[in-house]
Each structure stands twice: as C-alpha cells, then as structure tokens.
Curated annotation (Swiss-Prot):
GO terms for molecular function: rRNA binding; structural constituent of ribosome. The gene is rpsD. One of its GO terms (biological process) is ribosomal small subunit biogenesis. Part of the 30S ribosomal subunit. Contacts protein S5. The interaction surface between S4 and S5 is involved in control of translational fidelity. This is Small ribosomal subunit protein uS4. It comes from Burkholderia mallei (strain ATCC 23344). CDD domains: S4. Belongs to the universal ribosomal protein uS4 family. Keywords: Ribonucleoprotein, Ribosomal protein, RNA-binding, rRNA-binding. One of the primary rRNA binding proteins, it binds directly to 16S rRNA where it nucleates assembly of the body of the 30S subunit. With S5 and S12 plays an important role in translational accuracy. NCBIfam families: PRK05327.1, rpsD_bact. Residues 97-160 form the S4 RNA-binding domain. The keyword Endoplasmic reticulum does not apply. GO terms for cellular component: small ribosomal subunit. The keyword Cytoplasm does not apply.
C-alpha cells in the first residue's frame, strides 16, 4: 500500500474531524466543512454503520493521523498487545514516541508529514547522532535537535514560532533558541490530544 499523497483536507472530511494533517497557519474549519463527506453527494447520509465499520473507521483515522501504513500499524498493535497494561493506551504511546511525531510535537515541523520529511532528509539528530528513520522510537531523556545546516530553514523557524504560541505538550521540553528539545517521558493517555477511541481498535483486532 502506497502512502497517500492526495488532498489532506479530504481525509479529515472523510473522518468528520480534524486529523491535523494541515499546517496550523489556517484553521481547517475555514478551508472545508468537516461535517460533510467528500464528493458530490457528501451530504447524503447512508445506512447505519455496523460495529465492524465503526471500528474499521477508527483504525483508519488513527493510521491517517500518524501517517502509518497497514503493515506498520499491525506491528505496533502486536507490540502493544504483547506488553503489560492497557493495550489501546500502549498503542497510542508507541505512535506518539515515533521520531517523526516527536519532531512534530516539539514544533520543528508544522505537520507530521513535514516532520517526517525533516527526518528523512537528515535534518534531525537524536542525542547528537543523525537520525533518518521516522519510525525510530524515542526514549525518555533523549535529546532531539535540528542540525546546524537546517536551522535557517524558514519552514522550521515558522513552525517553531507557531508551536510556541499554541503551547507544547508537557512531556517535551524545548529550547527554541538552540532548536532542540528533550523527550521527558512517554505521555500518559490524558496527555495525548485528539478525538481517538482506541478501544474500538482493540475490539477490531480482537475479533
């Protein structure tokens, strides 16, 4: 399955909620109507969605939020299921600990896709070592930074400025002047923003 490269707003409309796939420079609600599905007949309501359909939609939504493909997502779920604790919460923690997501949460990229590109283009270091694998798991205490040669990129400066205005998660500490941040701890469920019902995903894979 190839990575989706079409209109990002269309995906958010399909899920009926902002998936934060677009930059925060302009509210997605100003760009499109989230309460109507994409397409000519988007306003027409269909038949009642089955339990399976609801669970599948939730999985698709989370995959799109984090930019993860099906095979990767299955691996994350298997790992979450293997660990002790709440499987759904652990799944989200694994996704939040991805390097591309941490770069996004620290404000170095205006979207996860942009953050993923920064990682792939070797603009990011973890503990002083260049990292270019977006799925790399970041651990508590790791220092994530922008490489010197990338610090003057306008998109990074602008993204960081917007992130500072909007506030950053409590589980990261960012020094904007140094273009670096510390992953303080794996976020608790209450710290993970987003309209996500992870229990539906657990139910789907438990079938």
């Amino acid at each position: 399955m190839a990575r989706y490269i079409g209109p990002k707003a269309k995906l958010s409309r399909r899920e009926g909620t902002d998936l934060f796939l677009k930059s925060a420079r302009r509210s997605l609600a100003d760009k499109c109507k989230l309460d109507s599905k994409p397409g000519q007949h988007g306003r027409i309501s269909g038949a009642r969605t089955s339990d399976y359909g609801t669970q599948l939609r939730e999985k698709q939504k989370v995959k799109r939020i984090y930019g993860v493909l099906e095979r990767q997502f299955r691996r994350y779920f298997a790992e979450a299921d293997r660990r002790k604790g709440n499987t759904g919460e652990t799944l989200l923690q694994l996704l939040e600990s991805r390097l591309d997501n941490v770069v996004y949460r620290m404000g170095f990229g205006s979207t996860r896709a942009e953050a993923r590109q920064l990682v792939s283009h070797k603009a990011i270091t973890v503990n002083g070592i260049v990292a270019n694998i977006p799925s790399q798991q970041v651990k508590a205490g790791d220092v994530v930074a922008i490489r010197e040669k990338a610090k003057k990129q306008a998109r990074i400066v602008e993204a960081l400025s917007l992130a500072e205005q909007g506030g950053m998660p409590s589980w990261v500490a960012v020094d904007a002047k140094k273009f670096e941040g510390t992953f303080k701890q794996v976020p608790e469920r209450a710290d993970i923003a987003g309209d996500i019902n992870e229990s539906l995903i657990v139910e789907l894979y438990s079938r």
